[in-house]
Structures are given as structure tokens and as C-alpha cells.
Amino acid sequence: DAISIDEVHLDMDDDCKYALVIQDFHTGDPIDLLRSRRTSVTEPYFVSIPATERNQVKYLISDMYNPYIAYVEKYFPNAVPVVDSFHVIQWITRSIDNYVRQLLKKYRQHDREYQDKLSYEQQRPVSLPPSDEVYLLQKYRWLILSNQSNIRYHSDPRMDSHFHVLMNTYDYEDALFRIDPNLKDFRDLKEMYVQFNSRNGGNPLLARNELKELIQTYKSSRNFEHFRNRFLFATRQTPVLNGITDYNPVAYYEEDDF
């Protein structure tokens, strides 16, 4: 009653770059392998399967590739799309990294403009070290992107070559959060999802209740809307995450909204 859809890069020829892998979600056994994920290949294949068989599928597990999610509406009317947790956390981490990179780009631009200003005023080339923001975002953004359980925090201070003061891991983390408060919100949300998965992987009822509490906690956050809709529901009107079937519809967002 649950199948997984994914692609594998083969690049055998122009018509066989990404093959489509169909698996039994419970056993992991392959059901079939299609030479391409193109509609011209997948549509005739799925349509050829008797409707009585397709109607027995309750869950379609995939990444956030919208054409895969659309298979539910087109071929599996009794199923709900499910985004696997690996791709959810991958999307969250990538989104946070993109946000950090935009901050880094902004502060680098500030550095260049300030350096140009000094060079003009002094009528000679001026070279400046990176600003505190650029230094932190460039060298320590891993503190935000990594799972906290994988970070080895050290409390013993060490001399920092940029700030010329003794600092430990907690100091760098606090300094990053002072650059932009959103960074802490995003990191905390990521950690809530990681912990949610580790606690509730085998208990749908507990997962459903905690998910509701998580949503309640963050529903008033001005930064949470885009995260919530994509990270839980992958741009569909009523998809389900991790097979939880008691869900609430959410606003639909197009790709351009992100």
C-alpha cells in the first residue's frame, strides 16, 4: 500500500539520463525501473497498470520534485504524497544556507563599498580585513547548518585570530545570532524537526500530537510560514509528512514564492 519513487542518474543516452526507480516502501524491493522520468515514458507506464491496482496505493513517498508529487492526482487517487524526512531536512538545510549566503553577500558588499570609500578619501589603495560579519558567516556558518548533536562544543576559550580575544564555540554561536535573529529561529526550527523525527519515527500517534504542538509553537512566527508550508507539505494542497494521515490543509505556494 506504499511505494517509493526516486531517480538514479544513468546518462546512457539522451533518452536515458535519469531512470525512474519504483520500490516497495515496506520491503525496499524494486518494483520496476523506467528508462526515464519524462512524462512521455512515465505516463503510458502508469496508465497501463489496472486502476484496481493503482487504487490500492495509500502512500506515495518521494522527494520534493513536484512531478512526482503530482503522480498522486494523476495515477493514484486514493493515495497521499509523502515527503521522506531525508529530503525534508535537506531542503531545510539548503534554505538556511541560501539565507546565510545572502547575508554574506550583503556584508561583503558593505566591506567593498567601505574600502572603496577609504581609498577614495585617502587617494591610495586601502586594503581592509573582512568585517566581523563576513568572518563569522564565512567561517562559522557550519554551527547553524550542522545538527547540534554532531557539533562538539568546547567551553575552553581559544585565541581568535580575527577578534584577538579568547572565544569558545558558544561565543561564536552567540555572535552569529547577533548578526541576524532569524538565524537562531531557523536553526531552532531545524533542530525541532530533527528531534521530532528521532523521537517519533515508529509512533504515528505520538508524532501527530507532537507535530501539532510544534505547529502551535511556531504559528505566530513571522519567519515560519514559508518553512512550514514547504517543509511539512512540499508545495501541495494536502500532502502528508512521514505518513501522518490526520492533517490540515495549508496555503498553496508556487515555486516562484521561494
What are these regions (language model features)?
Residues 1-12:
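Two-metal-ion RNase H-like nuclease active-site motif
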Residues 7-9, 22-25:
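Flexible glycine-/small-residue-rich
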Residues 8, 81-82:
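Catalytic cores of nucleotide-enabled group-transfer and carboxylate-activating enzymes in metabolic
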Residues 12-15, 25-27, 35, 52-77, ...:
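Acidic/histidine-rich catalytic cores and adjacent linkers
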Residues 17-20, 93-105:
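Short, surface-exposed amphipathic charged segments that create phosphate/polyanion-binding patches used
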Residues 39-46:
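Structural motif
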